[in-house]
């Protein structure tokens, strides 16, 4: 495993969708396909200039006419195509020194079998009730219940305390929040098409943007 992985260097990507692959033993493994092509370095930050070491990466493609002047100048200075998203990855100074502006970081940054964390924006569900949002139980269908089948029930008490406590689970917007799924294993890497096949599901809809980084809570193998 190279030094960039140890210090948190990751990749930006796009969720292509889900499929399944088969092992040599014939076992079926559900995987999510992530497109991590064309991760280009736009800036190298150093402790001397910026106070910390980091690598800034751009992903995606955007027309120059759709980028504001500040971003256009930033991309032009780096000599790279304008991207849809920028992300910094904190790395060691020695790892940052191995890269230069304009470099493309490939999927080979990771290895098959490595554990990664994948961050994305979950699918928005709109305004939802407590049954869908928090898995509450429904009220009785009959026996005197005529209009309270899906209500949450009591949300407070009487004059004391005379208020609804913060954090009370009620109806509201569901989804469309940033979430991270941890310790997903890379099942396969397609170097030609710059694809990562990750075991299991990752947050977000198809074509959603994701951030793939080395797992921060890797569990030690038993007997290791």
Swiss-Prot record:
GO BP of this protein: translation
Q: What does this protein do?
A: One of the primary rRNA binding proteins, it binds directly near the 3'-end of the 23S rRNA, where it nucleates assembly of the 50S subunit.
**Its Gene Ontology molecular function terms?**
rRNA binding; structural constituent of ribosome
What the entry lists under NCBIfam families is as follows: L3_bact
**What is the organism field in this record?**
Janthinobacterium sp. (strain Marseille)
Q: Which SUPFAM superfamilies does the entry mention?
A: Translation proteins
Q: How is it modified after translation?
A: Methylated by PrmB.
The record's Pfam families line, in alphabetical order, gives: Ribosomal_L3 (PF00297)
Provide the family line.
Answer: Belongs to the universal ribosomal protein uL3 family.
List the protein's name: Large ribosomal subunit protein uL3
């Amino acid at each position: 495993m190279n030094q960039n992985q140890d210090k948190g260097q990751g990749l930006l990507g796009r969720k292509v969708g889900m499929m399944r692959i088969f092992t040599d033993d014939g076992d079926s493994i559900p995987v999510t396909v992530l497109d991590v092509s064309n991760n280009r370095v736009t800036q190298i930050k150093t402790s001397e200039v910026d106070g910390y070491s980091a690598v800034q990466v751009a992903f995606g493609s955007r027309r120059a006419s759709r980028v504001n002047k500040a971003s256009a100048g930033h991309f032009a200075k780096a000599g790279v195509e304008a991207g849809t998203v920028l992300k910094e990855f904190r790395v060691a100074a020695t790892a940052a020194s191995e890269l230069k502006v304009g470099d493309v970081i490939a999927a080979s940054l990771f290895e098959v079998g490595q554990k990664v964390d994948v961050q994305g924006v979950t699918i928005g569900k709109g305004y939802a009730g407590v049954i869908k949002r928090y898995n509450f139980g429904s009220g009785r269908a009959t026996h005197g219940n005529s209009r309270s089948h899906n209500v949450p029930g009591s949300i407070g008490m009487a004059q004391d305390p005379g208020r609804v406590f913060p954090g009370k689970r009620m109806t509201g917007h569901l989804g469309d929040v940033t979430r991270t799924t941890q310790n997903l294993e890379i099942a396969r890497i397609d170097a030609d098409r710059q694809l990562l096949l990750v075991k299991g599901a990752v947050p977000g809809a198809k074509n959603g943007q994701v951030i793939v980084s080395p797992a921060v809570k890797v569990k030690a193998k038993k007997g290791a």
